[in-house]
Swiss-Prot record:
Keyword Ribosomal protein on entry: no
Protein name: Serine/threonine-protein kinase US3 homolog
GO BP terms in the entry: regulation of G2/M transition of mitotic cell cycle; regulation of gene expression; signal transduction; symbiont-mediated perturbation of host apoptosis; symbiont-mediated perturbation of host chromatin organization
Enzyme Commission number(s) of this protein: 2.7.11.1
Lineage: Viruses, Duplodnaviria, Heunggongvirae, Peploviricota, Herviviricetes
Encoding gene, per UniProt annotation: PK
Posttranslational mods: Phosphorylated by UL13 homolog; this phosphorylation regulates subsequent phosphorylation of UL31 and UL34 homologs by US3. Autophosphorylated.
Annotated InterPro entries: CDK, Kinase-like_dom_sf, Prot_kinase_dom, Ser/Thr_kinase_AS
PROSITE patterns per UniProt: PROTEIN_KINASE_DOM, PROTEIN_KINASE_ST
Summary of the function given for this chain in its UniProt record: Multifunctional serine/threonine kinase that plays a role in several processes including egress of virus particles from the nucleus, modulation of the actin cytoskeleton and inhibition of apoptosis. Phosphorylates UL31 and UL34 homologs, two critical regulators of capsid budding from nucleus to endoplasmic reticulum, thereby facilitating virion egress. Modulates and redistributes host components of the nuclear envelope, including LMNA, emerin/EMD and the nuclear matrix protein MATR3. Phosphorylates envelope glycoprotein B (gB), probably to direct it to the cell surface.
Family statement: Belongs to the protein kinase superfamily. Ser/Thr protein kinase family.
Origin species: Suid herpesvirus 1 (strain NIA-3)
Domain Protein kinase positions: 109-389
Length: 390
């Protein structure tokens, strides 16, 4: 049966501002012997740069940096489902959907269904003629597609997306990926309600296991969100879309803007130094959304205007106390004035407390959304809390 991988009703298209900020640059730490120099060519149509920090310091507005150039493709039909159209959109440096589909056919696949294109290429559900099992094809000609494939070839974990094949047709790379039932955001949308703590715990534990594996290999995902978590059911969960990943991460540094505004950690939004703890923040946002759907962590239904405005909304919604801001950071110097003192520091966030979430869930959310990244526990530490019953 053709399973669904519905990218069309995601917040990244309709509600929240999706952005692979520097996502095409993120994997440039891998395979330097094979891909030396490719990172210089990694760019987005709206953000061509080799050093994210340079542009951030220059004050480049977020509407340029935080961009998803496939946003204009969406069409909502009468049934509320969506499909991407409009090959005039330049998602992949001029590779149209028709051209990508022809390449997939030339590589021996029968294309069954187009999916919403991402910044790294055109995406299809397909299968080999005569075979029942379906796969997902990501077809792209940007260096980032090749680099994501090279990264996936290094990975082997039940909770991280695997790579079935990596094929090439001239300058175009085709990644052959497993086809899951849906992503977590679509799962929540289809059930139109939150998960209970038992199921939410199973999902987030799998995500944390995948993150612990990546972080153990010094890989930072940088775009952990419900749309990038794929599942068959709550016991079969996979963290995917490593197009924004950064490798060889050791000490905190400013690795550029990447990911999605609404799930970015405060240190990224403030353009401070950061490390793998940003993925733990993203997982905390995911846990909140699974338990509080359709509510969002910062409140409101409109997409974030830009990163700084979202950060201000976040500080106010959570009721972050001035003492919780990390010292000697731009986060403190520029944003502490938006903090409040109506809540004691290092206690449950106001936003979470008002919703009456399960006690275990509220505790995990607070830990993963610890505002100071130095105090924020790692994925491994959270997995060892001893409170998991799922």
């Amino acid at each position: 049966m053709l399973a669904m991988w519905r990218w069309v009703t995601k917040r990244s298209r309709l509600r929240r501002g999706h952005a692979h900020l520097g996502g095409n640059k993120g994997v440039r730490g891998i395979c330097s012997l094979y891909l030396a120099g490719l990172s210089r060519g990694l760019s987005r149509v709206h953000a061509q740069r080799s050093h994210a920090a340079t542009m951030a310091d220059a004050g480049i507005p977020d509407e340029i940096l935080y961009s998803d150039i496939s946003d204009d493709e969406i069409i909502i039909d009468g049934d509320g489902d969506g499909d991407s159209s409009g090959d005039e959109d330049d998602d992949d440096g001029g590779l149209t959907r028709q051209a990508a589909s022809r390449i997939a056919t030339d590589l021996g696949f029968e294309v069954l269904q187009p999916l919403q294109s991402g910044s790294e290429g055109r995406v299809f559900v397909a299968r080999r003629p005569g075979e029942a099992d379906t796969v997902v094809l990501k077809v792209g000609q940007k260096p980032s597609t090749l680099m994501e494939g090279m990264l996936l070839k290094r990975l082997a974990h039940d909770n991280v997306m695997s790579l079935k094949q990596m094929l090439a047709r001239g300058p175009v790379t085709c990644l052959v990926l497993p086809h899951f039932r849906c992503d977590l955001y679509s799962y929540l949308t289809m059930r139109d309600g939150p998960l209970d703590m038992r199921d939410a715990g199973r999902v987030i534990r799998s995500v944390l296991r995948g993150l612990a594996y990546l972080h153990g290999m010094r890989i930072m995902h940088r775009d952990v969100k419900a749309e990038n978590i794929f599942l068959e059911d709550v016991d079969t969960v996979c963290l995917g879309d490593l197009g924004a990943a950064r490798c060889n991460v050791a000490a905190p540094n400013f690795y550029g803007l990447a990911g999605t505004i609404e799930t970015n950690a405060p240190e990224v939004l403030a353009r401070d130094r950061y490390d793998t703890k940003v993925d733990v923040w993203g997982a905390g946002v995911v846990l909140f959304e699974t338990l509080a759907y359709p509510k969002t962590i910062a409140g409101g239904d409109e997409p974030a205007i830009n990163g700084e405005m979202h950060l201000i909304d976040l500080i106010r919604a959570l009721g972050v106390h001035p003492e919780e801001f990390p010292p000697d950071t731009r986060l403190r110097s520029e944003f502490v004035r938006y903090a409040g003192t109506h809540r004691q520091p290092y206690t449950q966030y106001a936003r979470v407390a008002r919703l009456g979430l399960p006690e275990t869930g509220a505790f995990l959310i607070y830990k993963m959304l610890t505002f100071d990244p130095v105090r924020r526990p790692s994925a491994d530490e959270i997995l060892n809390f001893g409170m998991w019953t799922v």
